[in-house]
Amino acid sequence: MIFGYARVSTAEQKLETQIELLKQQGCEKIYTDIASGVREDRKGLNEMLSFLREGDMVIVYKTDRIFRSLKNMIELIEFFNQKGVFFKSIS
């Protein structure tokens, strides 16, 4: 399955552009969060991670939408690798 993940930092920002781009990439299910990237309690991201299975793909608009830091990027990429999940950033 192809999953998308979109995040904005504040309610004033719009998710629609990211969601539209993810749909154009073939995302079947898109998870979203409205929260600062430094927060760890991103419910949409955590829910998506719990559903991932081998062969799935995660697509984001930009890497800063999913990764909070270099350390977090390494941890999530390792998680994807262990699960056999592919990762793609549109930009």
Model-derived features with residue positions:
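Short, structured surface patches at the beginning of a domain
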Residues: 1-91
